[in-house]
Amino acid sequence: MKKAKAIFLFILIVSGFLLVACQANYIRDVQGGTVAPSSSSELTGIAVQ
């Protein structure tokens, strides 16, 4: 039971980290920050100027 809890916790941390990373990338795309027309903004359908 303890091993399953540890695996669940690990997955939770990893997914949380991925969510934060994607969110930061999305916000940077929307604000038109350092990465100009990025591939992720094209994939999500945001108009690239």
Swiss-Prot record:
GO cellular component: cell outer membrane
The entry's keywords: Cell outer membrane, Lipoprotein, Membrane, Palmitate, Plasmid, Signal
Residues with lipidation of kind S-diacylglycerol cysteine: 22
Xref: PROSITE patterns: PROKAR_LIPOPROTEIN
Record-linked InterPro entries: Lysis_col
Organism of this sequence: Escherichia coli
UniProt main location, coarse: membrane
Protein's name according to its UniProt entry: Lysis protein
Species classification: Bacteria, Pseudomonadati, Pseudomonadota, Gammaproteobacteria, Enterobacterales
Leftover remarks: Plasmid Clo DF13 originates from Enterobacter cloacae but is stably maintained in and studied mostly from E.coli.
A GO biological process held by the record: cytolysis
